[in-house]
Amino acid sequence: MATPVVTKTAWKLQEIVAHASNVSSLVLGKASGRLLATGGDDCRVNLWSINKPNCIMSLTGHTSPVESVRLNTPEELIVAGSQSGSIRVWDLEAAKILRTLMGHKANICSLDFHPYGEFVASGSQDTNIKLWDIRRKGCVFRYRGHSQAVRCLRFSPDGKWLASAADDHTVKLWDLTAGKMMSEFPGHTGPVNVVEFHPNEYLLASGSSDRTIRFWDLEKFQVVSCIEGEPGPVRSVLFNPDGCCLYSGCQDSLRVYGWEPERCFDVVLVNWGKVADLAICNDQLIGVAFSQSNVSSYVVDLTRVTRTGTVTQDPVQANQPLTQQTPNPGVSLRRIYERPSTTCSKPQRVKHNSESERRSPSSEDDRDERESRAEIQNAEDYNEIFQPKNSISRTPPRRSEPFPAPPEDDAATVKEVSKPSPAMDVQLPQLPVPNLEVPARPSVMTSTPAPKGEPDIIPATRNEPIGLKASDFLPAVKVPQQAELVDEDAMSQIRKGHDTMFVVLTSRHKNLDTVRAVWTTGDIKTSVDSAVAINDLSVVVDLLNIVNQKASLWKLDLCTTVLPQIEKLLQSKYESYVQTGCTSLKLILQRFLPLITDILAAPPSVGVDISREERLHKCRLCFKQLKSISGLVKSKSGLSGRHGSAFRELHLLMASLD
């Protein structure tokens, strides 16, 4: 008789490279537990099917990193908020942009779809919460009350309330119909990262960076219990669908809690690090985590997890006898949510204000929607998920099969971390992954959307060179094409690269010694002139980095020499050069632009004033150079990320030049 195979309770499913740059947000579809959406610093939203290596769809249109993403309950719509404060809604079935919503003044930290009506709630770094009508492209209401960034938003199951968690250590409950705050729940001593409604009862759970989970009674508006002793900040919690327990995604573990009284039913070790989102499907809990550009998915078999009954660990009352029995989960001690009989009638009665009529101009919306695209990367998976062909419209959707659990003692290996396609310029280090998570299976290389073309700017901080050539720092020399390299030629090529780098560093050292000799005399202007005469931008950057640290070193005659070099730095492909150029230009604009404009606007004086004439000549020269740079700054102000913010700030400072 065959020995039954013992399988694992928790295991790693796969790891993929989800974006060409860092992943900044992700979310699981709660209906199926199989759809994953990721947002990245590359301004894209990518959709994935859990346990499949290929990207299904890539959504473009944002011009700054995507900070928050959320799927609606049927997994037909997705909303994404960016660092610039813009919000975009896509229809996944139609594969197109649905709405662009503008109004927040800072990055979007949290989003949620209304469970029935066509509404979206957004929370921002600007401390405001806004309720949007997707059909009317307008803000229905703005909720004010938090003093810091709003980190999480959740609609109640009946769609009447909205819970918000913020960095100001508070949880607030808002009445959508009345358009006002119902109650504030203080008690946390750190930023509140997540809130979650009980699926049936008037109960709310909140998790905080103070390592506690608090349960709130929504009838009496008071705390029910508090779970203390979490191993780290609480970032992800989820109620079981029948409401019998709460799952907390902790650092490298899953914990199962009850709340009356507070107790821990079970602890499952899962090496997922900082888990970002949880979902339940087929008695399996799916957890996803991200690090840099990698996203990892994990599975916990809930049939082998204690969810009620005997307590295995009690971090709150560990030294007290366990005499209380768990009540029947089916017997509710609180009011039950009453579902509305119609799907959209209740939310439409939301109190409106003057802001509800504010919409983006139609021409602006049309332009945004033209620039937004839904690129289907895998047509087969897309059709299977978003375009199912049921023979009869009443046929229930096909239920996903549970993931098979690997054997407990099998020397399994995880799927190989997918790597970017050859077209991708950014080389990402392969992360070490544990080898005791999933059964051995053929390694699958994933394909991710490849960015088009080389990066405009080479990052200043990186683990390895990215498209960096030492020969870029030397005069261009025509190199004849060579035939296929043999071993001797390869060694010669390696030595040639070494010689090139040696020449670069030797030249840099010599140039810096020359500038330093002049610098020690205390003549800053002559030092800068000598650096410019050397015709090596790297030396100019090193010198400006010193001058920028002490604003008092800047003089008007120094500006006339530096401004042409700043124009070159702003057009460089090296991030450090661009940063130095932006910093220097900002100092010049703040200290000298008012002086330049005042001198140029002043009427001519009577008689001959040589010093005034010299000052006027310098101001005219600086003004001409600033006008030349302003066009470059304006053209780059539409960039995303840090450079875009810096150029937009410079563009505002240079507005008086127009």
UniProtKB/Swiss-Prot annotation:
Q: Supply the PROSITE patterns for this chain.
A: WD_REPEATS_1, WD_REPEATS_2, WD_REPEATS_REGION
SMART domains in the record, alphabetically? Answer: WD40 (SM00320)
**Residues that bear Phosphothreonine:** T395
Q: What is the effect of changing S538L?
A: Disrupts KATNA1:KATNB1 interaction with ASPM
UniProt GO BP: cell division; microtubule severing; mitotic chromosome movement towards spindle pole; negative regulation of microtubule depolymerization; positive regulation of apoptotic process; positive regulation of microtubule depolymerization; positive regulation of neuron projection development
Give, from the UniProt record, the effect of changing Y574A. Disrupts KATNA1:KATNB1 interaction with ASPM; abolishes localization to microtubules minus ends; decreases ASPM localization to microtubules minus ends; no enhancement of ASPM activity in blocking microtubule minus-end growth
According to the UniProt record, where is the region Interaction with dynein? 1-284
Question: Manganese as a keyword?
Answer: no
Q: What is the effect of changing I610A?
A: Abolishes localization to microtubules
Stretches for region Interaction with KATNA1 and NDEL1: 436-658
Listed GO molecular functions?
Answer: ATPase regulator activity; dynein complex binding; microtubule binding; protein heterodimerization activity
**Gene3D superfamilies found in the cross-reference section:** YVTN repeat-like/Quinoprotein amine dehydrogenase (2.130.10.10)
Q: Where does the record place Polar residues bias?
A: 311-329
- What is this protein identified as? Katanin p80 WD40 repeat-containing subunit B1
Encoding gene, per UniProt annotation: Katnb1
